[in-house]
């Protein structure tokens, strides 16, 4: 039997390795920009064409490379960062494996121009698919210019699975922002198709955050600071009133490296417990500085998952530091334990005889006619108890207001027809009762139905808004004073794909430049809602769901509008409103579930009722 095991050629091995390290254009940006930071650059410029599919160019003024180093940099496991295995536990650089450039060169065309500091002549090198095509001396500036073209040109399967330009560019922005947040001492700029996206000068951390995410964030940040022999924690956390359901800015960095850490995230969330509504997420920018030997970053290809030797103590320190930051801002009420339990007794202050005394002795009312041995001699109460029951027979709706903080939103009428009008009329013609301002109880042919009024209205409005988008029949209500909404670069990148559908549903937006838009008109029926937060929520939902298909984008817009405009728990409804809500619900495409899969109706069948009363 002949031997069947053989070594793979280097170019195939590099393509396999590239599958882990280089997953999309954003991966190339991350690796090249981190290399520029490691090279000591004070200014880094990133130029992108077609979301990185055509060109990714990174220009830095770092220390550059010699001709030999430039050639060696593209060999597998060639690095200047480490020399021994022990160096893995004393890392102070972003890269160390020597895989990135070799992986990029395996799946793209690369042109490198570089000149080391103190030398007169630089080097120009060209590589395509791991093959060195040319290398020659060239006059160029100090530093390096990496130009990556035609990414995945020789791996068509990988290129086919790339997302839309909007999605891929948004991922590039995310990687750029993470590196910019941890290196405020480095000036950084980003251009896409020759349009400036970021121009971040060297600055402090707070100013860098503001330059990236907008001036409105400045007043919402609270300083975070904790120092111990184990770890130093710094950065910022957001005020509780800035928390939101989606699109929160949440970043962890350790020793200058971005990481994901669900366990530490729970520490932050515990500090915000009872300060923000359930489901809301706060902003935070948390930086850990600790001994490199106490962490392990070499456990994931992208180095975003990191193991900590002292995870539990750091968790406690982080939670305590966050609570302290919130307490200093009066977000957490402080308690004076010395006086909290003291009885509040007025202090005796004697007055002079010449001054009139304000003290009045308490009076005790005595019923002189009361005889304990005569049960008929005491006075009867003058209150007419029968008044308690006035109107009881006519009060068919029991309402307990659980919240008065929500704006009343009118129930929108859905112009849809029931699939079986006769059956629908029979089912909803029964009496309705409202329980705790949240549920509608009514009887159907199959039993007793308990309907969540908010979720039911979400389903009704969702179908209506989605129909308006599809039929391009949205009605717009122009506003007297346009609202200005400021988007981040990531939000602005996805907004163009939403504008047409936003227009169909009734929004009127105009571009003011610099990622700012004016809201000139709103969909009819939502005038009482905050238009800025509503538009931001729609964009955040589109980013969160990664909408690339047109239908998914339409659904994301319709769902955001429906959730914002639907009636809230605690809203009292009349019998006519409840009847109309139920009739509209059963006219929907799916009356059992909300668009995001939550239950609307809970049924209690006749059989279940009978079984409960058998005992």
Swiss-Prot record:
Q: Name one Pfam family in it.
A: DNA_mis_repair
Q: Name one GO molecular function term.
A: ATP-dependent DNA damage sensor activity
Q: Keyword annotations for this protein?
A: DNA damage, DNA repair
Record has Glycosyltransferase as a keyword: no
- Domain of life of the organism encoding this protein: Bacteria
Q: Which InterPro entries match?
A: DNA_mismatch_repair_CS (IPR014762), DNA_mismatch_repair_MutL (IPR020667), DNA_mismatch_S5_2-like (IPR013507), HATPase_C_sf (IPR036890), MutL/Mlh/PMS (IPR002099), MutL/Mlh/Pms-like (IPR038973), MutL_C (IPR014790), MutL_C_dimsub (IPR042120)
Q: Which GO terms describe its biological process?
A: mismatch repair
State the SMART domains in the record.
DNA_mis_repair (SM01340), MutL_C (SM00853)
What's one GO-annotated cellular component?
mismatch repair complex
- Similarity comment: Belongs to the DNA mismatch repair MutL/HexB family.
HAMAP family from the entry? DNA_mis_repair
What is the protein's known function? Answer: This protein is involved in the repair of mismatches in DNA. It is required for dam-dependent methyl-directed DNA mismatch repair. May act as a 'molecular matchmaker', a protein that promotes the formation of a stable complex between two or more DNA-binding proteins in an ATP-dependent manner without itself being part of a final effector complex.
Record protein name field: DNA mismatch repair protein MutL
Gene that encodes it: mutL
